[in-house]
Swiss-Prot record:
Known role: Catalyzes the rearrangement of 1-deoxy-D-xylulose 5-phosphate (DXP) to produce the thiazole phosphate moiety of thiamine. Sulfur is provided by the thiocarboxylate moiety of the carrier protein ThiS. In vitro, sulfur can be provided by H(2)S.
Primary location: cytoplasm
Catalyzed reactions per annotation: [ThiS sulfur-carrier protein]-C-terminal-Gly-aminoethanethioate + 2-iminoacetate + 1-deoxy-D-xylulose 5-phosphate = [ThiS sulfur-carrier protein]-C-terminal Gly-Gly + 2-[(2R,5Z)-2-carboxy-4-methylthiazol-5(2H)-ylidene]ethyl phosphate + 2 H2O + H(+)
UniProt KW keywords: Cytoplasm, Schiff base, Thiamine biosynthesis, Transferase
Catalytic residues (UniProt): 111 (schiff-base intermediate with dxp)
SUPFAM superfamilies: ThiG-like
Primary gene name: thiG
Sample GO molecular function, one term: thiazole synthase activity
Pfam families named in the record: ThiG (PF05690)
The protein's name: Thiazole synthase
Amino acid sequence: MVLTHSSPDLLTIGKRNFHSRLFAGTGKYPSLKVMQESLRSSGCEMVTVAVRRVQTMASGHAGLIEAIDWSKIWMLPNTAGCATAEEAIRVARLGRELAKLAGQEDNKFVKLEVIPDSRYLLPDPFGTLEAAEQLVKEGFEVLPYINADPLLAKRLEEVGCATVMPLGSPIGSGQGLRNAANISLIIENARVPVVVDAGIGVPSEAAQALEMGADAVLVNSAIALAGDPITMAEAMRWAIQAGRQAYRSGRLPERAAASPSSPTTGIIAEAKTK
């Protein structure tokens, strides 16, 4: 593939295009001001909003909706805190109304999370599939958070999900891409965008996900809990751009043996024998 500076490289989800391949979370920041500056520094164009936490004015979420310029950033309501498919479907509907209140009348996106496991926060594959099927029927653009299960990813694609979002490692763990082999299988077989979600701790791991062929990453804790969230957000921004460019450029094939970068003919010793 030959790239030029004018080569378009938009990420399309549903009917919406994005330039940035970094999706950011809005939780865990030390203040709304730091969140605002971090989002600006990241260059992101879509952020997740935990519908239940906004509704209940949970710590760090009071004033969240008013703090973001929704004319520039697309809202991705999520169903965090839902343990069953029924709960997730109900909260997704509330999320659609929340997006409308923010001025995004045509926003039907939902990040689907069905998590009954309170210790490791691992998603329920059965509840996720059940909720996804119903929400797709209702016209939602469903972005499901899942374990790195290639079969489940394909099934969710088949029922009409707009993306699949396999976890790199447990939410907030900072363990990186522990499921890289399975994520690669998902990427290889997917016909919808693959967004690596959860577990990314440092920019190099975000770059790795894009180098593998992931279409985007979602990062929250690694930015919000950094010593300097604003600078970390910028670091993630450049790492993701670098990873994407590397993927599009095509990496050097791996070899079992060395391959010299200098010519092996016409060397000095050879010239002296003549």
